[in-house]
Amino acid sequence: MPGGRDPMPSHTMELPRLIVIGEGNMGDLGPFLGSLGGPRTVSLISGRTVQGATGRKIEGSLKRSGIKWSWHMAGTNDPESIASVQEAVRSDESGMAVGIGGGRAVDTAKMAAFKLGIPFVSVPTAASHDGIASPFVSIKGDKPHSITATAPLGVFVDIGVIRKAPARLLASGCGDLVANMIAVRDWELGRDRKGEYYGRYAASLALMSAKIVMENAARFAREGVDERVVVEALISAGVASCIAGSSRPCSGAEHLFSHALDRIAPGAGLHGEKCGIGSIMMAKLQGQDWKGIAGALKSVGAPTTARQIGLDREDLIEALMTAQGLRPERYTILEEAGMSRRRAAALARVTGVA
C-alpha cells in the first residue's frame, strides 16, 4: 500500500433511495410507493389510532395506484409480537413492509422486512426519535441496545400529521438529537483509545443534526418547535448512522444510560427524554457545555430532571453504574470515568438531574 499503510476494511453503506417531506400529502403515499418499485401488494404495519386517523387517505391513494394492501397492528416491540407481525406479512406475500406510526410500528415493520428480505418504507407520524431513517431497531427483552436490521428504502413524511402528535413527542425527538453531541465525542474516544473506525463525515452530519436544536432552541422557546426542522434533522441523523454502518454517531453513553433505565424502570419516560437527561450528565463528564444542553432541552419543553419522568435518585444512580456493562465493547466516557456509586450520586446532584 502507498505509504506503507494497511488496507482499510470494506465499509458498506445502505441508504434510503427516496425521501419526501410534505404537508397534507398523506394521500400521495400510493404514487410514492409505486416510484420505489411498484409493489402489487404491501403490508401496512401501524397502530389502531394511527390507522383511524390516516387509513382512509392511505387506502384511497393505494387503490388509485393499483396497490393491494393489508393492515397489521404493531404490538409492544417484544420478539413475540414482532414475529407475529412477520408471519402475517409473510402470509400476505407482500412486496413491501410499510411502517406507519411511531417507534413501535416503524421498528416492527423494519424488523419484519429485514427478516423476510423485502423492502421497508418508513412513514413516521411523530418526530420522537431518529429511527425513522436508520437501520436500527430497539426490541424489548432482546439485547439491551439497538440491533441492526435494514435501512428504509424510502421515507415519507406528512408534516401535517406530525404537527397533530403530542408536543411531548417532538420534544423527545429533540432530546434524541442533542444526544448526538455525546455520541460523537464517545466515538472519538473509541477511535483514540481503541483504534476504532471513525467516520468523519458521518460524525459531522450527526453533529450538525444536534446543532440544529442547540442553535434554534431560543427561537423554538419563543415561537414553538418547528416540526419540519426537527424531522429533517432526525432523518439526517438516521442517514449518518447509515453512512457510519453503525449507531456510533448517534448512540453513546447517553443511550446506554437510557437502555439501563429501560431495565430498571420500564415505561418511565420516552426514549428521547431519557437520552436528553443522560446527555446532560455525560456532557459534564466529557467536559462539554452541559448547562447549554440543559437549557436547550428546557427551551423545547423536554425534561431535564429525573422527577419529571417519574424516576428517583436511586434509579439514576443505578443506571449510571450499570450502563457501560450493557455494551462493554463500545467504549464511552463511562468506562473512562469509572462510575462508582459515589461518583454517580455526585454527577446527578451537580447537574441538577436528581
Swiss-Prot record:
Pfam families in the record? Fe-ADH_2
Catalyzed reaction equations: sn-glycerol 1-phosphate + NAD(+) = dihydroxyacetone phosphate + NADH + H(+); sn-glycerol 1-phosphate + NADP(+) = dihydroxyacetone phosphate + NADPH + H(+)
Protein residues bound to Zn(2+): 176, 255, 271
Q: Which GO terms describe its cellular component?
A: cytoplasm
Just give the chief location class. Answer: cytoplasm
Query: Where, in this chain's numbering, is NAD(+) bound?
Result: 103-107, 125-128, 134
The protein's required cofactors: Zn(2+)
Q: Does the keyword Oxidoreductase apply?
A: yes
EC number assigned by the record? 1.1.1.261
Biological process, per Gene Ontology? glycerophospholipid metabolic process; phospholipid biosynthetic process
Q: Which InterPro entries match?
A: G1P_dehydrogenase_arc (IPR023002), G1PDH (IPR032837), Glycerol_DH (IPR016205)
Q: Which residues bind substrate?
A: 130, 176, 259
Cofactor binding mode, per the note?
Binds 1 zinc ion per subunit.
| Broad EC category | oxidoreductase
Signal peptide range: none
Q: Which GO terms describe its molecular function?
A: glycerol-1-phosphate dehydrogenase (NAD+) activity; glycerol-1-phosphate dehydrogenase (NADP+) activity; metal ion binding
User: Where found?
Assistant: Cytoplasm
Please give the subunit comment from the record: Homodimer.
PANTHER family to which the protein is assigned, alphabetical? GLYCEROL DEHYDROGENASE, GLYCEROL DEHYDROGENASE 1
For this protein, the record's HAMAP family field holds: G1P_dehydrogenase_A
What this protein is called in its record is: Glycerol-1-phosphate dehydrogenase [NAD(P)+]
Q: Which taxonomic lineage does the organism of this UniProt entry have?
A: Archaea, Nitrososphaerota, Candidatus Cenarchaeales, Candidatus Cenarchaeaceae, Candidatus Cenarchaeum
Which gene specifies this protein's sequence?
egsA
